[in-house]
């Protein structure tokens, strides 16, 4: 899809290391007020 390669626009302040599950990134991005990312 058009959003399949979307990433957080700003590095997460709370999420450390590599994302192992998209849901982790999505939650971190949303928690910090950014659009959902992969």
Curated annotation (Swiss-Prot):
Keywords: Antibiotic, Antimicrobial, Cell wall, Fungicide, Plant defense, Secreted
InterPro entries: Defensin_plant (IPR008176), Scorpion_toxin-like_sf (IPR036574)
GO cellular component, one term: extracellular region
Gene3D superfamilies registered for this protein in UniProt: Knottin, scorpion toxin-like
Localization per Swiss-Prot or TrEMBL: Secreted, Cell wall
PROSITE patterns: GAMMA_THIONIN (PS00940)
Pfam families the record matches: Gamma-thionin
Covalent S-S links between cysteines: none
GO biological process: defense response to bacterium; defense response to fungus; killing of cells of another organism
Tissue specificity remark: Distributed in the epidermal cell layer of leaves and in the subepidermal layer region of stems. Not in roots.
Chief place where the protein resides: secreted
Its job: Antimicrobial peptide. Active against Fusarium spp., Gram-positive and Gram-negative bacterial pathogens.
Family of the protein in this entry: Belongs to the DEFL family. Group IV subfamily.
Name of the featured protein: Defensin D7
Record organism: Spinacia oleracea (Spinach)
């Amino acid at each position: 899809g058009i959003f399949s390669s979307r990433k957080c626009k700003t590095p997460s302040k709370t999420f450390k290391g590599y994302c192992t599950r998209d849901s982790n990134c999505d939650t971190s991005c949303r928690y910090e007020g950014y659009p959902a990312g992969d």
